[in-house]
Amino acid sequence: MSLLIKYLSLCWFRNNPADFHPSHAFMWKTVIFYLISGFIVEGLIADPADGILEVSLRAIMAFASIGTLLLFVKRWECYNQLFTAIFICENFIMTLATITEGLYFWMVMTHKENAEEISIAIGFLLVGWYIAIVSYILRQLLVSQMSHSVILAFSYFILTYGIPMLFMDI
C-alpha cells in the first residue's frame, strides 16, 4: 500500500519514480486495473466490444511507445519503473474520468444547464493534467529538459489515445 501511495504522489508532482522498484505482482495489478477501468470508461462511451478493442490497442501502444523511447535513449533498465509510474497515474486519471461520466449522467438526468460544457471542461482539465503528469515522470526518470519531456508526453498521448481512436474510426 505504501508503494501505491508513493506512486500516486507522482500525480501531484512529488517523488521520483527512479526511487521505486515495483514487484511483478504490483505491476500486473496495475495493468489489470488499467484494462478494467479503461473497459468501463470506453464501455460507457461506446459499444463495449469497440471499447475492449480500443483499450487493448491503447495498452499495446503504451507498452510499445515506452519500450521504443527507452531503447532510443538507452535506458531499458527503467522500463518497469516508467510503465508502472505512467499506468498508476493514468489509472488515477481514468478513475476521475469515470466519476466525471457519472457526474455528467446525473447532471443530464436532473436537467442541469450546461451539463455537456461542464463535463467537456473537466475532460480537458484531466487531459492537461495527464500530459503534465507524464511529462513530470519522464523528466524525473530520464532527466530530460522540460520542453523535451512535454513534447514526449504529448507524443505519448497522441500515440496511446490518438492512433487507437483513429484505428477505431476506420
Predicted features, each with a name:
Residues F92-T100, E117-Y136, I158:
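Hydrophobic alpha-helical membrane segments
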